[in-house]
């Protein structure tokens, strides 16, 4: 795939368990491919799984009206971008003069797409709905929906992406000494901003 993520070695994440958890917790992704000679992107939920060969895959679907749907038949290479928490880091939080920066977590997943049959697409929808209905007080199930409602499933293109490569980055002020690192965490926690606090928690886990 022609798009790559710039990752300084200090911020590279190669912990497979962490990456899998990150994808599971931040499943709303951007699916990118080449469509009609241009890069095309769609925001969709994707879930991590394994295929019958035991290989890791991402499962999802898009509308049949989306130009990407037709392009998958000609070009099976895709990129899924997963973004996590992020926050501004003020240089006023350091004990020395420096420039501000931004801390964040991100994962790029590269793979080859395979379109599902209608039967497979129903199974895919079940997995997606079951995952996100799990916290609902009255969870719905695909199996319980009427035939009329399920006709809408004919309007989607379901697929799985066999993962060929993963690039993961966690930029969490790893270049700072312990004193400044701890102060960044403290200042982030004072903001009462959910994103900032999430980054503070990630920093605590990282050192």
Where are the predicted features?
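Residue-level recognition of well-ordered beta-strand positions that form the cores
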Residues: 45, 61, 81, 112, ...
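C-terminal edge-of-domain segments
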Residues: 1-5, 118-207
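Structured helix-beta-strand junction loops
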Residues: 25-26, 74-75, 191, 206
């Amino acid at each position: 795939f022609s798009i790559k993520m710039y990752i300084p070695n200090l911020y590279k994440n190669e912990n497979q368990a962490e990456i899998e958890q990150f994808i599971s917790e931040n499943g709303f992704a951007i699916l990118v491919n080449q469509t009609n000679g241009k890069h095309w992107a769609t925001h969709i939920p994707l879930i991590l799984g394994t295929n019958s060969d035991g290989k890791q895959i991402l499962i999802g679907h898009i509308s049949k009206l989306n130009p990407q749907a037709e392009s998958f038949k000609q070009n099976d290479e895709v990129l899924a971008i997963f973004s996590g928490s992020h926050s501004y880091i003020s240089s006023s939080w350091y004990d020395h003069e420096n420039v501000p920066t931004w801390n964040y977590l991100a994962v790029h997943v590269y793979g080859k797409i395979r379109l599902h049959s209608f039967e497979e697409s129903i199974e895919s929808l079940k997995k997606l709905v079951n995952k996100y209905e799990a916290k609902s007080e009255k969870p719905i199930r695909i199996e319980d929906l009427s035939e009329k409602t399920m006709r809408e499933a004919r309007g989607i293109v379901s697929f799985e992406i066999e993962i060929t490569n993963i690039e993961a980055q966690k930029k969490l002020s790893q270049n700072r000494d312990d004193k400044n690192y701890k102060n960044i965490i403290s200042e982030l926690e004072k903001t009462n901003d959910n994103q900032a606090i999430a980054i503070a928690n990630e920093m605590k886990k990282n050192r």
